């Protein structure tokens, strides 16, 4: 399909923009039938070979907190202004998760929670929860700005959950039920504060609020509070560039406290994407283009740790993964001198993109956390759905027209203020959404359709005027619309989102078979106005002052062409040639050492030998294996005869954008080619955001 030039105000080199658009043209598949979208798999981190890929979820799951109860793991996270809130996910292997409940269905604390009286809670609502289990009861504590600390509790994580409020607000808190029966919460940023909660969790113990860890020790925000083998640990993240994760440790709450960095500079090869300048909420927006420099790498931050029954420890954290939102990753934890470092023994502080699954004692089927598609035939919405703010439950229905979601329009000046917009997290790295809309029940002034909720946002909608129907695409970046005439109010609407390029394209169809693009490419940007990633949304509102008609949606299908971290099979038993992505140099064996040589045609054919769990050895034609000696310094990557061991074994790491890394089991670091032709090393800590640091390779099959 011919792509139109993107229309938006942008500052930055034009070459980068052209590259981004060219990548989209190459990457974009065009699905032309609705039937092709049914039954497609959704993102799952499990690679099916004993390994997993980060992120665990390729959709927004921010401020995660995790607990283990027996052999079961539970996870919750921030939901801000969306309802229901505080999702509860369950797993038995830390990789395959499934949503089982929300802690609450609605949180209505005033007109701003309902998008009434010109007020909203975008970027607010409920956030940064602390998940705990104590004496048979599950607890979730979470702050709401201006409304204090919310406490939810249940005997069963599937609910029902009860709720009470503590008037004082404790932002970014973490709760510890201590061995002496006291209940403590740490909170705040920089200077970490601690306060004791009363026994029934209805208030704070007077006189107990104080600074626990002074700002001078360099702690951050988003604390996670633990007591492990008699010692107290607090894990936090430093806000700003590179956001390292810090850990404070003490033998007693009174101190003294020590602090070390346990995770730093791990971006998983992801750099900063599009960003709106300032906090403008009206067009035209000024959008800065991607900046893949190391100084703006998007590092893992804000998370905690959990122990498995086998004694392994694992870390969880989030990453500002551009417009798709803040994503959760899983990290092996290595204890050194009583400190829980994220990463492997030879590469402390750095999380592998692909690694072997945790030893939890359970082998689970490959599972996605949500059923994203919905045919609206059931008595309830799929659990993936969340309303934008508190809905008016009298203005939507699954029963008025069985098999359809019916949205009755309410007055709103624009989509931002439209009540009863039904949303779900957009999913990466790439997805297409299709819905069938019957707009015969719309009234003049109604507009109903499919949107990308973000700031700026965009939508494709059917409009009812005094003289009939039209279809319109609105791009808030520019504030411009593109219109087309339609002969029927029965349409199929689609949006394709590529979160690698951060470009979306809307299209529509009169028959559900052939789709026509409408409008230019829409730039999806990461922003802090909503403090969430992009969300798909179904909506219906009236541009007048009174309620209008109704819109009926027949289905909502999500298609993900790249639902696995291993984007293509490892070429086991095939010979490949490797080329450095940075400069096009080939890898070749010269004088018994692996070297980078100019000219792709000079590369050595290396046979990929399966070593299990996604690990491989690289065999030369004469039966020798690429081997890492010593610390993997330049010149220590050679070829050796004999049966391959750890020195000859590499984790095959697919970075999901066509490039591959090789993680040495001997050094826990990556093979890296020098900038100029020369000997190769295996001492690189991890990929740079621009993928041009010599650790990223492309491979092709070659004759043996």
PLM region spans:
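N-terminal secretory signal peptides that target proteins for export/translocation
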Residues: 1-15
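Lectin-like carbohydrate-binding module/patch detector with strong preference for beta-trefoil
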Residues: 567-704
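Carbohydrate-active catalytic/glycan-binding domains of CAZyme proteins
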Residues: 3, 36-570, 605, 647-651
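Sec/Tat signal peptide C-region and signal peptidase I cleavage site
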Residues: 31-34
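Residues marking helix boundaries in flexible regions
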Residues: 26-27, 57, 571, 577
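Bacterial N-terminal signal peptides
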Residues: 19-29
């Amino acid at each position: 399909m011919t792509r139109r030039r993107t229309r938006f105000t942008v500052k930055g080199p034009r070459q980068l923009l052209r590259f981004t658009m060219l990548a989209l043209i190459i990457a974009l598949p065009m699905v032309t039938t609705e039937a092709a979208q049914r039954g497609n798999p959704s993102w799952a981190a499990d690679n099916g070979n004993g390994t997993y890929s980060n992120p665990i979820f390729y959709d927004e799951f921010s401020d995660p907190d995790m607990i283990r109860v027996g052999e079961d793991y539970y996870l919750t996270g921030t939901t801000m202004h969306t309802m229901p809130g505080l999702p509860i996910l369950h797993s038995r292997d830390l990789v395959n998760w499934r949503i089982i409940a929300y802690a609450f269905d609605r949180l209505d604390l005033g007109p701003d929670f309902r998008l009434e009286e010109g007020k909203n809670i975008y970027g607010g609502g409920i956030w940064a929860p602390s998940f705990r289990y104590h004496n048979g009861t599950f607890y979730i504590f979470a702050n709401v700005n201006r409304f204090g600390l919310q406490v939810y509790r249940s005997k069963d994580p599937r609910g029902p959950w009860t709720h009470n409020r503590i008037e004082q607000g404790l932002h970014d808190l973490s709760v510890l039920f201590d061995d002496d029966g006291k209940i403590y919460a740490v909170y705040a940023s920089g200077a970490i504060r601690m306060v004791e909660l009363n026994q029934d969790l209805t208030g704070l113990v007077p006189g107990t609020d104080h600074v626990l860890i002074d700002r001078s020790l360099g702690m951050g925000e988003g604390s996670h509070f633990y007591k492990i083998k008699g010692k107290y640990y607090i894990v936090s993240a430093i806000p700003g560039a590179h956001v390292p994760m810090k850990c404070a440790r003490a033998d007693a709450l009174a101190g003294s406290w020590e602090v070390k960095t346990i995770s730093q500079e791990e971006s998983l090869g992801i750099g900063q994407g599009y960003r709106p300048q300032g906090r403008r909420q009206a067009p035209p927006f000024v959008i800065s283009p991607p900046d893949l420099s190391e100084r703006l790498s998007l590092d893992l931050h804000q998370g905690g740790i959990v122990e498995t029954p086998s004694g392994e420890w694992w870390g969880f954290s989030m990453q500002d993964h551009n417009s798709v939102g803040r994503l959760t990753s899983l990290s092996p934890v290595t204890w050194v001198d009583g400190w829980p470092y994220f990463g492997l023994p030879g590469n402390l502080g750095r999380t592998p993109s692909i690694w072997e699954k945790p030893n939890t004692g359970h082998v689970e089927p490959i599972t996605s956390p949500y059923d994203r598609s919905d045919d609206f035939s059931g008595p309830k919405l799929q659990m993936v759905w969340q309303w934008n703010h508190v809905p008016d439950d009298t203005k939507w229905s699954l029963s008025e027209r069985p098999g359809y979601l019916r949205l009755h329009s309410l007055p709103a000046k624009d989509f931002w203020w439209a009540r009863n917009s039904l949303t779900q997290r957009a999913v990466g790295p790439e997805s297409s959404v299709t819905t069938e809309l019957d707009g015969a029940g719309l009234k003049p002034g109604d507009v109903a359709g499919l949107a990308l909720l973000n700031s700026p946002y965009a939508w494709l909608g059917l409009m009812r005027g005094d003289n009939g129907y039209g279809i319109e695409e609105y791009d808030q970046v520019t504030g411009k619309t593109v219109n087309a005439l339609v002969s029927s109010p029965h349409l199929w609407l689609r949006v394709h989102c590529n979160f690698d390029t951060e470009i979306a394209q809307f299209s529509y169809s009169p028959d559900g078979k052939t789709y026509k693009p409408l409008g230019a490419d829409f730039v999806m940007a990461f922003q802090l106005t909503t403090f969430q990633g992009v969300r798909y949304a179904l909506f219906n509102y009236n541009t007048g002052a009174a309620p209008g008609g109704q819109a009926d949606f027949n289905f909502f299908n999500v298609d993900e062409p790249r639902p696995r971290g291993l984007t293509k099979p490892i070429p086991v038993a095939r010979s490949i040639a490797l080329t450095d992505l940075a400069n096009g140099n080939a890898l070749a064996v010269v004088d018994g050492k692996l070297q980078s040589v100019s000219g792709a045609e000079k590369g050595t054919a290396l046979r990929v030998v399966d070593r299990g769990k996604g690990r491989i050895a690289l065999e030369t034609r004469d039966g020798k294996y690429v081997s890492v000696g010593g610390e993997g310094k330049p010149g220590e990557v050679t070829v050796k005869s004999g049966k391959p061991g750890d020195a000859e074994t590499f984790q095959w790491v697919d970075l999901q954008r066509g490039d591959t890394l090789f993680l040495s089991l001997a050094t826990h670091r990556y093979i890296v080619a020098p900038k100029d032709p020369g000997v190769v090393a295996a001492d690189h800590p991890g990929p740079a955001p621009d993928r041009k640091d010599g650790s990223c390779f492309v491979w092709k099959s070659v004759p043996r």
